[in-house]
Curated annotation (Swiss-Prot):
Interacts directly with FtsZ. Contributes to the efficiency of the cell division process by stabilizing the polymeric form of the cell division protein FtsZ. Acts by promoting interactions between FtsZ protofilaments and suppressing the GTPase activity of FtsZ. The lineage of its organism: Bacteria, Pseudomonadati, Pseudomonadota, Gammaproteobacteria, Alteromonadales. GO terms for biological process: division septum assembly; FtsZ-dependent cytokinesis. Its main location: cytoplasm. InterPro entries: ZapC, ZapC_C, ZapC_N. Belongs to the ZapC family. It comes from Ferrimonas balearica (strain DSM 9799 / CCM 4581 / KCTC 23876 / PAT). It holds the Pfam family ZapC_C. GO terms for cellular component: cytoplasm. This is Cell division protein ZapC. It is found in: Cytoplasm.
Amino acid sequence: MYITPEPCWAWMYHHDEDKLALELGEDWLFLSPFSARHLIPDSLHGAAFSAQHADYYNDVLDRLRKQLPNSAPEVVQIALNLTAAHFFSLPMMPKSWFFQTSAHIAYACNGKLVELDTGSERARFAVVDGGEQSSLLMLLEQSLALGNKKTMKQFELIKVMNDRLSPCQSLKHRRIVAA
């Protein structure tokens, strides 16, 4: 079942878990993977889940549902993480050098799935914030080795130039294993 935004939803910073969280009701809390060092300072003081947040969430949820074979709770988790990242992540500079230039460039729009190629491995990402030149992306795979002993974990963010984005291949057969 897909959940729809409610007026009671509110962002808060969960200090015990060191994560941005979304209160979904009295006894229901969604923990994002984002800690304070990746978030803008305003996110640490809480905020309402605004109409702008709801619009973004609904848009990416609809786009993800059409692209992923995952269960509703897994797709909701990805959509909520995209929403948190879109509104509360710190600005980043592109780190395109980790990835090969794509022969078939994918257009970047929020919630779209794309692939990046490190030269030794391909991985799926969701577009958090698609720009004209570069885009902020969220890793959907469990992990991705970038080289120089650097590894990305699921739901980590990276910004890259759009010439690195490739269309995803055979999405309906490959589920994302969400943590």
